C-alpha cells in the first residue's frame, strides 16, 4: 500500500495526499482535483520515488480568494457604521424640523415688526411734515401780520393825531369865540372891574373865561 501526494501549482503551497492505494489495483481515480488546473503528483513506495505533472480536463473554475471583506468582524463593523449613520440622520431631521418651526415663527414676527415699524416711521414723518408745514405757514404769516399790524398802528396813530388836532382846533375855536363874545357883551363898569385886568374879581362860568384882555 502507498499514498499519492499531489500539489496544485497555482494554488496554496501545500501538499495533499490521497487515501491508501492497493498496489494490486490496475488504476486509481484521484478525487478532489479542480478542472483545468495543473498538479504535481508524487509517489513514495519501497524506496521508489515517482513524480509527474498533469493537467486536469474541463474548464477552469475561477475561484474567489477569501480576504478581510468576507470576514465576520469586517461585516459587523460595516453594519455598526451604517446603523450609527442612520441614527445621526434621524437626529438631524428632527432638529431641522424643530428649527424650521422656530425660524418660521421668528420670520413671521420679524415681518410683523417690519410692517409696523415703517407705518410708525411714516406716521411720525407725516406728523413732522405737518408740524414743519404749520411752522412755515406761521413764520410766513407772522411778517405779514406784523406788517399789517404796523400799518394799522401807523394808520391808527395818524387818525388819532388828526382827531386830536381837530378836537383841539374845535376847542380853541370855541374858546376864542366865547372870549370874543364876552368882550363885546361888557355893558358897564362892574363888568370891567371883574375883567382880567382885575384878577381878584374875575368870575368864570363853567370853567371858561368870560373875557380876554390883550396885554402889551
Curated annotation (Swiss-Prot):
Extracellular compartment spans: 1-73
GO biological process: cell adhesion; cell differentiation; nervous system development; positive regulation of axon extension
InterPro entries in UniProt: FN3_dom, FN3_sf, Ig-like_fold, Neurofascin/L1/NrCAM_C
Pfam family, one: Bravo_FIGEY
Positions annotated as glycosylated: 22, 46
Occurrences of domain Fibronectin type-III (ranges): 1-64
Entry keyword set: Cell adhesion, Cell membrane, Cell projection, Developmental protein, Differentiation, Glycoprotein, Membrane, Neurogenesis, Transmembrane, Transmembrane helix
CDD domains recorded: FN3
Transmembrane segments: 74-94
Main location: membrane
Cytoplasmic side: 95-216
Location of the protein in the cell: Cell membrane; Cell projection, Growth cone
Annotated segments matching region Disordered: 127-149, 173-216
GO cellular component: axonal growth cone; plasma membrane
Entry membrane topology: Single-pass type I membrane protein
Biased composition (Basic and acidic residues): 128-139
Expressing tissues: Expressed in many postmitotic neurons in 16-36 hours embryos. Little or no expression in the olfactory placode, the anterior lateral line/acoustic ganglia complex, the posterior lateral line ganglion, late-developing hindbrain neurons and some Rohon-Beard cells in the spinal cord.
Family designation: Belongs to the immunoglobulin superfamily. L1/neurofascin/NgCAM family.
Entry function: Cell adhesion molecule with an important role in the development of the nervous system. Involved in neuron-neuron adhesion, neurite fasciculation, outgrowth of neurites, etc. Binds to axonin on neurons.
Name listed for the protein in its UniProt record: Neural cell adhesion molecule L1.2
Amino acid at each position: 500500500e502507498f499514498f499519492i501526494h499531489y500539489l496544485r501549482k497555482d494554488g496554496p503551497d501545500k501538499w495533499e495526499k490521497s487515501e491508501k492505494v492497493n498496489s494490486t489495483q490496475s488504476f486509481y481515480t484521484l478525487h478532489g482535483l479542480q478542472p483545468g488546473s495543473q498538479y504535481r503528483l508524487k509517489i513514495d513506495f519501497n524506496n521508489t520515488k515517482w513524480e509527474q505533472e498533469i493537467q486536469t480536463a474541463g474548464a477552469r473554475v475561477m475561484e474567489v480568494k477569501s480576504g478581510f471583506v468576507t470576514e465576520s468582524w469586517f461585516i459587523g463593523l460595516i453594519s455598526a457604521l451604517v446603523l450609527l449613520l442612520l441614527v445621526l440622520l434621524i437626529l438631524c431631521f428632527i432638529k431641522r424640523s424643530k428649527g424650521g418651526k422656530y425660524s418660521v415663527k421668528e420670520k413671521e414676527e420679524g415681518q410683523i415688526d417690519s410692517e409696523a415699524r415703517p407705518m410708525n416711521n411714516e406716521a411720525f414723518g407725516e406728523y413732522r411734515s405737518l408740524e414743519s408745514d404749520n411752522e412755515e405757514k406761521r413764520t410766513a404769516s407772522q411778517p405779514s401780520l406784523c406788517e399789517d399790524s404796523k400799518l394799522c398802528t401807523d394808520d391808527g396813530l395818524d387818525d388819532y393825531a388828526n382827531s386830536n388836532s381837530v378836537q383841539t382846533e374845535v376847542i380853541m375855536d370855541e374858546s376864542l369865540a366865547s372870549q370874543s363874545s364876552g368882550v363885546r357883551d361888557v355893558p358897564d363898569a362892574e363888568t370891567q372891574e371883574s375883567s382880567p385886568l382885575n384878577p381878584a374879581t374875575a368870575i368864570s362860568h363853567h370853567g371858561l373865561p368870560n373875557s380876554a384882555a390883550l396885554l402889551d
